[in-house]
């Protein structure tokens, strides 16, 4: 039955950023304004909320395969690899993943490190959007970005070393 139904794509929003970029119109909030830091986000509560939201709409997509998942934000790379491992496992338990599913995570070069990239890859994420608008310090400052050009280059290198080949 899944072969006759149109493919399904899923967007998952992460509403937190270390700092809100002045050009960003997306729903995102700085964690400090809510009493927690970027490294102690309420992951368990957010996971429960996302799964409850999915469960509420499962009847609308019954029998369909997910072909793509895009995790945007905000800054999804603020959440741990363990969070995404659980999230993806729970989604797949509810809806089948197509062979060759593409799972994208937006990541800010200022919030990543080698271990996180390795963990994201192990969790099932196979595509990264690194959000590198520039390598020039003056442009990065004007854009309100939290990373430097060197950090952007390091992030690409670390992502490749972690096994990511689909990076943009």
Predicted features, each with a name:
Residues 28-60, 65-168:
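Conserved non-cysteine loop/helix-boundary elements of the Radical SAM core domain that shape
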Residues 1-11, 62-64:
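N-terminal [4Fe-4S]-dependent radical SAM core
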Residues 9, 22, 103:
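Divalent metal-dependent hydrolysis catalytic cores, especially in the metallo-beta-lactamase
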Residues 13-28:
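Local cysteine-cluster metal-coordination motifs and their immediate loop/turn environment
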């Amino acid at each position: 039955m899944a072969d006759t139904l149109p493919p399904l794509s899923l967007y998952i929003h992460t509403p937190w950023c270390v700092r809100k970029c002045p050009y960003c119109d997306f729903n995102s909030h700085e964690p400090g304004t809510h009493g927690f830091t970027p490294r102690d986000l309420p992951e368990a509560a957010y996971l429960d909320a996302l799964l409850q939201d999915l469960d509420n709409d499962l009847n609308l997509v019954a029998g369909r395969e997910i072909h793509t998942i895009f995790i945007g934000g905000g800054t999804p790379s603020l959440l741990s690899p363990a969070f995404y491992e659980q999230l993806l496992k729970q989604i797949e338990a509810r809806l089948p993943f197509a062979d060759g599913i593409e799972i994208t995570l937006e990541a800010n070069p200022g919030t990543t490190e080698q271990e996180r990239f390795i963990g994201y890859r192990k969790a099932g994420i196979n595509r990264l959007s690194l959000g590198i608008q520039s390598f020039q310090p003056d442009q990065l400052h004007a854009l309100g970005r939290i990373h430097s050009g060197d950090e952007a280059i390091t992030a690409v290198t670390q992502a490749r070393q972690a096994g990511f080949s689909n990076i943009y």
